[in-house]
Structures are given as structure tokens and as C-alpha cells.
Amino acid sequence: GLPIYLHEKDKNQTGFLVEAWPCGLVIEIGPVAQNHYDSEITERFLIILNFLGDLISNLKNNRISLPNEISFFVHQNSIDYPRNKNYDIKALIHPLRINNDWKGIDEGEPLFLDINDNVHTYKEKEIIYPLFIGEAAYREKNIAMSFTKKEILKCDQEWINGFLSFLNL
């Protein structure tokens, strides 16, 4: 399925698309270069919207039921590239991180690699799930990647009833 990313208001980060929508829901298909229009990505987006419409219709007509639990990823913080005293980037995303969004990393695993082959590692004990790894659009915001924590929501009957009520089903 599609990963669910919860990015609650982070006062340190502004200017993101989710801030422009009153419901706070954004479906992002990417990565996409800025000011680049790609018909394949637009087509993928339409497929997802149609799928979500069918899913809600099937739920409304009792042809499917909600799962017992839902995994989602909650934004924790974002980190910048390692920089020198002149604020120049001194290390790049480690090759093991490239194209590995949504995959958990443990303490000691590589994040960055500098020109001298020095590896900068993840230092926390708790598993973290990085997203937006090396996204060009976020470099100007000094974001090399964002860290999320994976959580599981148990979908008991009370939650399911509330969700269906929210959707007016």
C-alpha cells in the first residue's frame, strides 16, 4: 500500500505544500524536479485518486472492511548535510541511503559519506525511518533527509465507527 506520513506542524519547517490545504492532506507523487511536468507522474496520480475513490465506495457499500491495524510514519525532525565552518556541504548522502526512503535504520548505520571516505552514522538507539533522502527541492531548506518514527494504529470498532462517520459513510 501507500505509506502514510504524518507531518504535524513543525515550527522549524515552513513553506511546504501541506500548509496550503485546509484539510492538511496531501498526496505526493515523486520525486519530481521543480517546474517539471511529467505526464507519466500525472497519470500515476490519477490512478491513485481513482483507486482511493473506488476504495471509499467499496467501504461505503460494505464490499471491503478496514484492516485491523494501520502503519504510519510520524515526522520527528529533519537533518541537514554535514557542513564545514564556511557552511559548505562536506559530505553527501551515503550510497546505502539512496532510494531507500521508508526503510528503517539502526544505530551505527551510515547516513553520509565525505570525500575522504569517512562515514557519518546514525547515532540514536531507536530505529528511525528516513524520508525525502537527498531531495533537491529541500536542499535550499537545509534538509538532507527527514526522520520519522513508525507507529501502528489498532483499528478497534470505536475507531472504525469514528472513521466511517468522518467519511459520512
Sequence positions of predicted segments:
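Structured catalytic-domain cores with a bias toward divalent-metal coordination
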Residues: 1-169
